[in-house]
């Protein structure tokens, strides 16, 4: 287990190690950012598994974006991201969508990890 800031840094570092990604952002990517890219999204914190209440469960949403027309590129990137993450990060779910405004493909992936309270 580790603290919240370290968890987000580990995720960002793992994303940066995925060679296919052209950028990793904490907020929205710039409008001229080449595809594919990643954005760190929402973070939700819930009670952990321990009776002592010294643990927290974090859910972190990652957003992968691609202008490639089709789902294959994002599915491959999701696999690469999972492989790059430390072993204690658990894949929870993902949803693959098409952003109608931009025409880009969008994969929202939720990760689960445990950290120490406070």
Specify the residue positions occupied by each region the protein language model found:
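Charged, amphipathic alpha-helical segments and their flanking helix caps
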Residues: 1-28, 42-118
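Low-complexity, acidic Ser/Thr/Pro/Gly-rich terminal tails and inter-domain linkers that flank the onset
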Residues: 36-42
């Amino acid at each position: 287990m580790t603290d919240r800031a370290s968890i987000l840094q580990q995720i960002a570092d793992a994303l940066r190690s995925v060679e296919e990604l052209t950028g990793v952002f904490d907020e929205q990517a710039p409008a001229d950012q080449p595809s594919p890219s990643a954005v760190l999204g929402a973070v939700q914190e819930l009670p952990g598994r321990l009776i002592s209440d010294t643990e927290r469960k974090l859910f972190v949403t990652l957003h992968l974006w691609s202008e490639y027309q089709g789902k294959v590129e994002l599915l491959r990137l999701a696999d690469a991201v999972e492989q790059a993450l430390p072993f204690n990060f658990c894949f929870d779910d993902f949803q693959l969508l098409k952003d109608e405004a931009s025409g880009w493909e969008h994969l929202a992936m939720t990760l689960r990890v445990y950290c120490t309270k406070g």
